[in-house]
């Protein structure tokens, strides 16, 4: 009996081993071979000077308070890109946002939309002394352009404009219409910028072939088992929701506290939420990422990624160990604000907190809110949503001509990169354009290493001069490729 069982066990292990090896062997590369491109004439010095000057404009996301800065930025654009302003149609939308239309020769072709935003987040005054170069100096030093907006997102705005200006100078004329949309309030929701541009295009019955917005980057030294840079394209983004949790009690003197105080009840609710994370699962964008990255990785990683039918629990457990990768697995929840009390010897009659949720595709605002209610399980805790919220995006299909063109363009401008779809865990202005196309891709060819993650919205934001020139060439090549016959 024991011998029979041992024989069966060995046979099962042998069959399993064969299946694993066969699946690794059939785990073929999804990368494309791209032909070399013609070199476009670009003045690096002029382009760097333009971006440097743009960073000096303090276009913080409070347009009413910074109207003069946005006007100055628009004036810089007019001076730096005369052909763009002469040959494209420009419209101001929602006070400070801009929509450029480059009319194509063949109106039967669906247009494409290139997006970026001109506004930036503020700089915490307490951190200014920690910057190596002043945050709004636009300093060019050590091979970098420094300052707020260098990575998010003035480099996109100006790279797109530099690309179009250079193409116009070379007498390029597009077959399909190209829209350039630059928002002025992306960092605070995009309600008066991108949302109004999208509404304007919708009122004109515009149907887009695809949208390319900011988003994921070219990551180096971040993905274990991958030696090459990873160019990740956001094919979906998480939803956004903030909930206010509040508790009201009678208050009173702190020398005679009741069994349940407002602060105690609220902190108990927060502790329960922290102890019950949303369920983990490999969403379609994350599975797609591993399908594209896996064949290019070391053998041990290939075995796991080629056999997710067996190893997905192991992969989920591994990803959950890091905040950066845990966000790919589940809806995340983080307390971000607390408010209670007026002095040390008075029980507050009200305590409140705000929790911010980033909702994974496949879930919804309603389901996430219901999960929070179930975990808190306390009717004395009032739960109210903030007015600005967005559902998770649809997942764009990678088996389309638009994705293939973007994939090809990345390989033409960054030959060493491994291209893969992925999930963007943040939110972008592209969510306002969802009704105009199913093909929305979030990518910017800026190199990001482990030390650069904290620069986004943080200290020492910068972009290398080399990366910035590559951004310009990327957008120019993308426009050229979208105006060749699509297969």
PLM features: residue spans?
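N-terminal Sec-pathway targeting helices
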Residues: 1-13
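Acidic-enriched catalytic cores of C-N bond-cleaving enzymes acting on peptides and small amides
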Residues: 26, 30-34, 201-210, 217-228, ...
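An extended, acidic, His-containing surface patch that forms the Zn2+-binding/catalytic region
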Residues: 42, 90-91, 101, 107-109, ...
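Short glycine/proline-enriched loop/turn "hinge" motifs that connect secondary-structure elements
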Residues: 129-130, 171-173, 234-240, 327, ...
């Amino acid at each position: 009996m024991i011998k029979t069982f041992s024989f069966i066990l060995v046979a099962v292990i042998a069959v399993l081993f064969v299946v694993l090896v066969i699946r690794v062997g059939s785990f073929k590369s999804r990368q494309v071979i791209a032909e070399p491109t013609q070199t476009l004439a670009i003045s690096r010095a002029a382009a760097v000077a333009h971006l440097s000057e743009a960073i000096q404009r303090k276009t913080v996301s409070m347009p009413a308070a910074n109207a003069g800065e946005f006007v100055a930025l628009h004036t810089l654009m007019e001076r730096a890109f005369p052909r763009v302003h002469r040959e494209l149609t420009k419209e101001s939308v929602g006070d400070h946002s801009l929509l450029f239309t480059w009319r194509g020769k063949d109106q039967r072709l669906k247009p494409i939309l290139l997006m970026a935003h001109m506004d930036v987040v503020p700089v915490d005054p307490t951190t200014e002394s920690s910057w190596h170069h002043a945050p709004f100096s636009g300093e060019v030093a050590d091979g970098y352009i420094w300052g707020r907006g260098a990575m998010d997102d003035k480099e996109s705005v100006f790279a797109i404009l530099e690309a179009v200006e250079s193409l116009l100078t070379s007498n390029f004329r597009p077959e399909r219409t190209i829209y350039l949309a630059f928002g002025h309030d992306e960092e605070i929701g995009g309600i008066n910028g991108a949302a109004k541009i999208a509404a304007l295009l919708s009122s004109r019955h515009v149907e887009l072939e695809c949208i390319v917005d900011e988003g994921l980057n070219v990551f180096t030294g971040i993905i274990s088992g991958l030696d090459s840079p990873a160019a990740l394209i956001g094919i979906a983004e998480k939803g956004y929701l903030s909930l206010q949790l509040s508790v009201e009690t009678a208050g009173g003197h702190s020398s005679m506290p009741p069994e349940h105080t407002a602060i105690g009840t609220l902190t108990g609710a927060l502790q329960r939420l922290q102890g019950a994370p949303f369920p983990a699962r490999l969403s379609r964008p994350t599975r797609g990422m591993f399908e594209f990255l896996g064949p290019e990785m070391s053998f041990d990683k290939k075995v796991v990624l080629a056999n997710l039918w067996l190893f997905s629990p192991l992969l989920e457990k591994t990803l959950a160990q890091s905040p950066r990768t845990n966000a790919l697995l589940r809806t995340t929840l983080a307390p971000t604000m607390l408010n209670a009390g007026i002095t040390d010897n008075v029980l507050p009659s009200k305590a409140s907190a705000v929790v911010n949720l980033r909702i994974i595709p496949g879930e919804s605002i309603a389901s996430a809110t219901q999960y929070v209610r179930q975990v808190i399980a306390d009717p004395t805790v009032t739960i109210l949503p903030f007015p600005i919220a967005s559902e998770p995006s649809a997942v764009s299909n990678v088996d389309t001509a638009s994705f293939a063109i973007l994939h090809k363009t990345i390989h033409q401008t960054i030959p060493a990169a491994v291209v893969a779809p992925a999930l963007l865990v943040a939110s972008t202005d592209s969510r306002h354009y969802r009704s105009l196309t199913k093909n929305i891709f979030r990518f910017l060819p800026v190199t990001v290493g482990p030390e650069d993650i904290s620069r986004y919205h943080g200290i020492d934001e910068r972009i290398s001069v080399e990366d910035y020139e590559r951004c310009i060439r990327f957008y120019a090549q993308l426009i050229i490729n979208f105006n060749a016959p699509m297969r």
